Amino acid sequence: MSTAGPRAGSAPGRVPTGGAALREALVALQRDLAIDEATVRRIVEGAVVDTYRRLVADDPEVQARVDLGAGSVGLFRDDGRGGSAPVEAPVADFARQAAQAAKAAVAGWAREAERERVIREGMAQKGELIDVLVERLDGALWWVRAGNLAALLPPEEQTPGEQLQRQQHLKVVVIDVRRRQRDAVVVVSRTHPSLLRRLLEQEVPELADGRVLVKAVAREAGRRSKVAVHAPEAGIDAQGACIGPRGVRIRAVVSELGEEQVQVVEWSADPAEYVASALAPAQVSAVELDNETRTAHAVVPDDQLSLAIGRSGENARLAARLTGWRIDISGESGHPRRETATSPAPEGEDAG
């Protein structure tokens, strides 16, 4: 389609761009992406001018005017008398290239707008619990959706052994928004400590209103977790509130986590008491602290030693992560110590 000269019945300078088709495309973009008319006009006009300067002449005074009703664009420049003079584009195939550039510009704007929307909505929900629908598996990656927000559940954030199914509903916590060159993706987790924290807040009114606080969470997702809780005001049983009458509240949380064992312990400002509490269900006879190395030596009855350590060191390891202390455990009769190293608490876990 050439614009080497004015077409019969057309105004000089008019760039034909497929009329009805362009008009329908622009209307659809405005509807689906909520692009206002002024923005569409600005994007299309800029793309047409850029095409003219690239193919015809680098004239800084050339401007474009889009007619959304007709689905066409006109080129003009200031005539110096307060009016405008039409500008021809005497290049074969200019109209097609201008139309392609306009559509590409709108698509690029829409892509960037979508990227910013994902970033904005994802950041607003970071750390929050959301309900999602499992949509599809892409290799080891699960894609899930919450309303109009698609999210990624990568392998490292999937609970070991948990088998997901398409169209399955589940709860996840938003942990990140990854900015990529052309888009952005929200990352969610089933293993992050914040998931357990948010699930408890959902089930325990005393947590939701601040009468009970979650001070720390340590998880080995799919297997076992420990949660340290505290009630700032006297007279409130923080541990009992989280467990609920006959364990109904904690069972609701466990059922969402695929039968992961969740143990609620009392937090204490006294590190020795806190370490003893964190080693439950084992009974602890005494705890000695080395503040310089931040090491706690716990002494337990001989028949409690295996329980304090746990299978493959699991109980002691979680207690160390929960408290932020390195914990050595020995029996009362002087059994060799079990050393349990601890590293800084992962994101979302507070040593309290």
Positions of predicted regions on the chain:
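RNA-contacting regions in translation and RNA-metabolism proteins
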Residues: M1-G352
